[in-house]
C-alpha cells in the first residue's frame, strides 16, 4: 500500500543518511513487503548490507540512533551475524524499522551452499524487495546472491522433508526451520 511504501522510503532515506556511507544495499521483507495488513505499530523489516560493521555502528551512534557501544555492536556482528537493531528516528514518529545488519561477506555465506544456520536464508528466499543500493553493481550482486539462494532451496530443505511435498508444505517447512529457534513476541495462536 502507499502508506507502507511512503514510510519505508522515508526510513530508507534517513537510515542511509545516518549510516555514514557504510550501507551498500537495503532489502525489505516481511509484512510490509507482502502487504499482509501490518498495523501502524508494525516495524518495517529491512536487511541492511554494510561495507564495515564498525563504520556503520559508529555513524548510527554519532547520529544518536544507536543506544549501545559501537565496539559491542561491531564485535557481536562478527560472532553471531546478523545483529538486529530497531531504527526509530524521531523516537519512532516517522516509523520504525527492524534491521538485520549484515556485511557482504556474512550475507554471501548465509545465502551460500553451507550456511551456519537458516536465519537469513529462510527470510530471503521469500518475497523481498531491493529498496536501496549505493551502486548498480551492489544491486546486481545482491540479486545474484538471492537468485543463488533460491536455486538451492530444495538442497538445504531436503534433510528436513519427509514424504511427498507440495508448495504449501515446502513453504511451511521453510518457515518452521528459519523461525524455529527464535524467541518471538508474537502470539502463539
Predicted regions and their residues:
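Catalytic core of pol beta-like nucleotidyltransferases
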Residues: 1-22, 27, 33-41, 50-189
Amino acid at each position: 500500500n502507499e502508506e507502507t511504501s511512503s514510510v519505508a522510503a522515508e526510513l530508507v532515506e534517513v537510515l542511509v543518511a545516518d549510516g555514514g556511507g557504510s550501507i551498500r544495499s537495503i532489502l525489505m521483507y516481511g509484512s510490509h513487503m507482502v502487504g499482509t495488513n501490518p498495523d501502524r505499530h508494525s516495524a518495517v523489516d529491512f536487511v541492511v548490507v554494510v561495507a564495515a560493521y564498525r563504520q556503520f555502528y559508529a555513524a548510527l551512534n554519532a547520529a544518536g540512533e544507536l543506544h549501545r557501544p559501537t565496539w559491542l555492536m561491531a564485535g557481536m556482528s562478527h560472532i553471531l551475524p546478523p545483529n538486529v537493531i530497531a531504527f526509530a528516528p524521531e523516537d519512532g514518529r516517522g516509523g520504525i524499522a527492524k534491521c538485520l545488519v549484515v556485511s557482504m561477506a556474512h550475507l554471501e555465506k548465509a545465502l551460500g551452499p553451507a550456511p551456519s544456520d537458516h536465519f537469513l536464508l529462510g527470510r530471503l528466499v521469500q518475497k523481498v524487495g531491493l529498496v536501496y543500493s549505493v551502486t548498480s553493481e551492489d544491486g546486481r550482486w545482491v540479486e545474484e546472491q538471492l537468485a543463488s539462494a533460491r536455486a538451492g532451496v530444495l538442497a538445504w530443505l531436503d534433510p528436513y522433508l519427509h514424504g511427498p511435498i507440495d508448495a504449501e508444505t515446502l513453504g511451511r517447512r521453510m518457515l518452521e526451520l528459519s523461525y524455529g529457534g527464535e524467541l518471538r513476541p508474537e502470539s502463539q495462536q
